[in-house]
Design a protein with these regions (language model features):
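Hydrophobic/aromatic beta-strand elements that line small-molecule binding cavities or substrate pockets
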Residues: 44-50, 78-85, 112, 220-223
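Sec-dependent N-terminal signal peptides
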Residues: 4-13
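Hydrophobic/aromatic-rich structural module bridging two neighboring secondary-structure elements via a short loop
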Residues: 61-113
Length: 261
């Protein structure tokens, strides 16, 4: 459900597309809840780490979210997600563990490759599963880099197919991105090199190509800076939405490798 958080948290430097290795913390809360929703309160935290290795990027996210419903119910979601994407954007690995109310609901790992004619993803859980992929697939880092490139060129729309490996046996999603005109922040939030004066308002809609529906599965509204940092973003589901605000960010050391990107 919240696996979209990981790709949207990646930090990119436009100059040479140098990714900043970092440790970031986001606080999650309920943004809006419609009349038909039972959810009236959301509290959570996401801890994200990005590390540059010799041939690609290691990323990890630990998520803890509490939901409260109108009938005095409460549920807890815990998630640990790790990924690795090569600099070329042709190979991708993923590892996921999910728990709901301390009961494990997801536990799998896998990899995907789009460098050959027979592109596919392999999932390993109780057994091995193979999912074919279309040729024009992007993994999370590649997709976000291309969104930033489109914004730099003053393009208003960017469309792509993304594979995340966020659900067992899941294929790709079709993503439509609307890029708004660059704006200034009303106030300065962080005294940090990651924080800039300007941002692009972007809106992303995620569609399942296997479902004949014009309605997206979910949407994201975010403030995207030129260096790739997202200070705030909102995830819209059917009858409620969650807002995530950056609460802390720190630079961490890269591995001792020659910069090949």
């Amino acid at each position: 459900m919240f696996r979209i958080l990981l790709p949207i948290l990646l930090l990119f430097g436009i100059k040479g597309y140098a990714i900043e290795a970092h440790h970031a913390e986001y606080m999650l809360s309920l943004h809006e809840s419609s009349v038909g929703s039972d959810i009236y309160e959301v509290e959570g935290k996401s801890v994200y780490k990005l590390k540059k290795e010799c041939s690609g990027w290691n990323a990890s996210e630990e998520l803890l979210v509490f939901f409260k419903t109108k009938n005095n119910g409460q549920s807890k979601l815990e998630s640990k997600w790790k990924t690795f994407e090569t600099f070329s954007g042709e190979a991708y690995q993923f590892d996921l563990i999910d728990k709901i109310n301390d009961e494990r609901t997801n536990n799998f790992f896998g990899f995907a490759n789009i460098s050959s004619e027979n592109n596919n993803a392999k999932y390993f859980s109780d057994k091995e599963y193979i999912v074919p992929l279309e040729n024009l697939i992007e993994f999370p880092i590649t997709q976000l880099k291309n969104i930033i490139l489109a914004a730099e060129k003053n393009k208003k729309i960017y469309n792509s197919n993304i594979f995340m490996g966020s659900e067992l046996l899941d294929g790709h999603r079709v993503v439509s991105v609307i890029i708004g005109k660059q704006k200034k922040y009303k106030e300065k939030i962080f005294e940090d090199k990651f924080y800039e004066k300007l941002y692009w308002p972007i809106n992303l809609a995620y569609y399942n190509p296997e479902q004949e529906s014009e309605k997206p599965e979910y949407r994201i509204s975010a403030k995207l800076q030129k260096n790739g940092v997202l200070i705030e973003y909102i995830i819209f589901y059917d009858n409620f939405s969650i807002i995530s605000k950056l609460s802390n960010i720190e630079q961490i050391d890269d591995s001792n490798c020659v910069d090949t990107n």
